[in-house]
Amino acid sequence: MQWRRAVAGLVVAVGVVGLFVTGVGWNEVLEHVRAAHPVTLAGALVAGLGMLALRGALVKRLLAPIDGAASGTTFATAYLSGYFARSALPWGRSTGTPVMAFLLARDSDSEFEDNLAVVAAAEGFNLVGSLVLAGIGIAIFATVGGGSIDTVIGSLAVAGGGGLLTAGALVVMFNRGVARRVSFGFAARCETAIGSLPRLPSVEGHLTNRIDGFFGTLEAIQASRRTLVAAFGIAVASWLLNALPLYFGLLALGVDVPLALVLVCAPLASFGGIVPLPGGSGGIEVVLASLLVATAGVPADVATAGAILYRLTTYWAHFAISGAVAVLVSVFGTKPALPIDRGL
């Protein structure tokens, strides 16, 4: 049933993108896509794959304090299988997080709550990295671009302000223990309620111990300055590689948009992923094309073609690779084939 829902969601996502392209001009957009320079487009694909590798490196780095965490081929297959769930499920950043944590825990000697804390922290670093890169891009464009950036500033203020407010609230909650106290209280009440039911085994301490492990892992990450610096650097670098496919995709269409502007548009477009479709399909394409039209003066059909190429070399390429790994894992199992993998 879950596979059917995922497939149905993907069909709807493709349909929404198709409606968007039709509204702009199907023939015009398709003509631009077909005329894209293949070598430059290959550069976009390479950058997109580099971004996927860095996202995995971020999770791997945050797993360092976890005893018995997945490593080597085991980590790679679990991470990519989880990334497939993240890509295939609506609101994948939220719904895919526990799936990835479960797979990382299942294929290792670590606990689910520890991996959940790591994956959630990685999503937080990615959010901060996107806002930092957008800020860098707008600073560079304002300094040397010489163009109007009113639309960019407005978009950055809305998206960045909301993102920073959310991130700040989470930091305050974690540092002051608000989230921990609330979670413990809720879990304790649940344990009491379940324990009062007849014919059910006692679960006293089960939920609270899990929550304690979750917050303990977050505290371990927070206590390591080296881990924080490394994770922040990887997150920003991954977003740089996430923006380059847009730059190369536009070059493949013969459009030379300032790189600084691309560094702003790519992160801001990710906020279009709020739509409840796999990978934010439809929303991201619309937001990205609109930003290119409003800020760079790119014609609507060319901007839409650029958005399509960008998504093909990032989201859909990642979806294909992680999906292939997920299928192989489901067919052949999760244990590494080579003994040397356990030493990686």
What are these regions (language model features)?
Residues R34, T74-L80, S238-F248, P258-G273:
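Hydrophobic alpha-helical segments embedded in the membrane of multi-pass proteins
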Residues L54-S81, L250-V264:
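Membrane-embedded helical hairpins/re-entrant loop segments and their flanking transmembrane helices
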Residues D67, V172-F215:
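Membrane interface segments of multi-pass transport proteins and intramembrane proteases
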Residues V29-H37, G68-S71, S108, T217-S224, ...:
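Helix-boundary and loop/linker segments of multi-pass membrane transporters
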Residues V203-L253, L259:
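Alpha-helical transmembrane segments and their immediate interhelical loop/hinge regions
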